[in-house]
């Protein structure tokens, strides 16, 4: 006679279910590695065939040498302009996390208010839409006039650039919260604040995190452009300074540093999204 325990044991397909997932993950990794190798091969082929001047398109080896030179001390010179590549990148990331972090918090507050209070949406939606359509560098000059050329205008730029996408995503997600869940929470005596924190925000979390990912992407592109003004140390300042002296290998190295760190930040936000909202996987 079959016992309930044996039926349950045979009904557990977890190990078999995980194998296809792992296989698909490794296939994606393999395809990306192949694509990377192909791109490097094409890059080297351009150099071998001398399709462009090495001054304009440096070889992978030249970029590698630039990495070594900017990562340590060579001929008595430390890194680039006294700072190593990782220090330049770290300073830019610090600006992003402080400035964009403030913008994300502001966007969450504005978005929740817009999504829960119709009159707030009527008042604030045009202003948020106006800021959203402005290129961040369009008001950077005004921020320099107001705050000078040090850190303050850069941080304000990042905060203002990061706020609109989070506010729009949050407002839309909060307004679309399941009515049945909201009414059920109110029926058991939950106040407005409890409904927002216990029902509305958890249901809106996936869309909010998508807005946060967009905000950090906008902030990254904005800080690199902002660092062209008194941006040393900083990865944008490094690129701008190297461009002045036609150091294309250092410029490309800086671009790689930006791209790789940006991918890592986005991957981290995606993992955080999957952890906080496992019921909704992002493509």
How would you name each of these model-derived features?
Residues 1-37, 267-283:
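Transmembrane alpha-helical segments of polytopic membrane transport and secretion proteins
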Residues 49-101:
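Periplasmic/extracellular loop-to-transmembrane helix junction in inner-membrane transport proteins
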Residues 86-98, 121, 128-131, 148, ...:
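Alpha-helical membrane-interface segments at transmembrane helix boundaries
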Residues 98-128:
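Transmembrane-helix boundary motif in ABC transporter permease subunits
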Residues 129-165, 172-173:
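Generic hydrophobic transmembrane alpha-helix motif, especially the helices
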Residues 145, 174, 221-258, 277-283:
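Glycine-rich helix-loop "coupling/hinge" segments at transmembrane-helix boundaries
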Residues 156, 160, 192-226, 249, ...:
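Transmembrane alpha-helices
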Residues 166-211, 235:
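Short cytoplasmic-facing helical segments at TM-TM junctions of multi-pass membrane proteins
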